[in-house]
Amino acid sequence: MSQTCQTGYAYMQPFVQIIPSNLSLACGLRILRAEDYQSSLTTEELISAAKQDAEKILADAQEVYEQQKQLGWQAGMDEARTLQATLIHETQLQCQQFYRHVEQQMSEVVLLAVRKILNDYDQVAMTLQVVREALALVSNQKQVVVRVNPDQAGAIREQIAKVHKDFPEISYLEVTADARLDQGGCILETEVGIIDASIDGQIEALSRAISTTLGQMKVTE
């Protein structure tokens, strides 16, 4: 056993610490008390436990950091998906607005062109053509009353015979003035119902057909 003399003060008496390769006894101490050695061991255990606790705290902190890092990444991805969905929705709305605008413009252009062409025709001749087409729909009726614009009623009466001869099934055909109708207006009254064959009505039907066609094109796309 070797003896090392050191000067110092501690909360307990100097003692010998047993180390496998070395055993040293404090200066002036010949006997190692059991309680002193046990106290030394307890102190070392506390230090060791403290180190383990510190290591565990560091490990837990690292784990929490990784978890928060993963949560941050996931939150970023969720935010990106939300932003993407918002942009897609806004783009779809803009496309719908654009299509509606184009649809309205196309419809207006087509209808304007049709009206311009119709205005170049003789209005009485055009009304007679409308009457002819309407009579074809009710040719199985015996009696038909044709209502037209008052300004055209006289001219239509003078020429209605030319149209009537193509529909011999109709035994009675009368032309009467109706102030509610514009030029080109034509309403046929029969025993089973009324048919509005006015040019304005046909143009409106054309407008609806254009809108329907454009709507189907958008769905297909």
From Swiss-Prot:
Induction / repression: At 37 degrees Celsius in the absence of calcium.
One of the record's GO cellular component terms: cytosol
Name of the gene encoding the protein in the UniProt record: sctL
Annotated Gene3D superfamilies: 1.20.5.2950
Keyword set, alphabetical order: Cytoplasm, Plasmid, Protein transport, Transport, Virulence
Full protein name: Type 3 secretion system stator protein
Pfam families xref list: FliH
GO BP, sorted A to Z: protein secretion by the type III secretion system
Lineage: superkingdom: Bacteria
Compartments where located: Cytoplasm
Entry annotated with the keyword Protein biosynthesis: no
Role played: Component of the type III secretion system (T3SS), also called injectisome, which is used to inject bacterial effector proteins into eukaryotic host cells. Acts as a regulator of the YscN/SctN ATPase activity.
Natural source organism: Yersinia pseudotuberculosis serotype I (strain IP32953)
UniProt key word Transferase: no
Entry similarity comment: Belongs to the SctL stator family.
Subunit structure: The core secretion machinery of the T3SS is composed of approximately 20 different proteins, including cytoplasmic components, a base, an export apparatus and a needle. This subunit is part of the cytosolic complex. Interacts directly with YscN/SctN (T3SS ATPase) and YscQ/SctQ (the major sorting platform component).
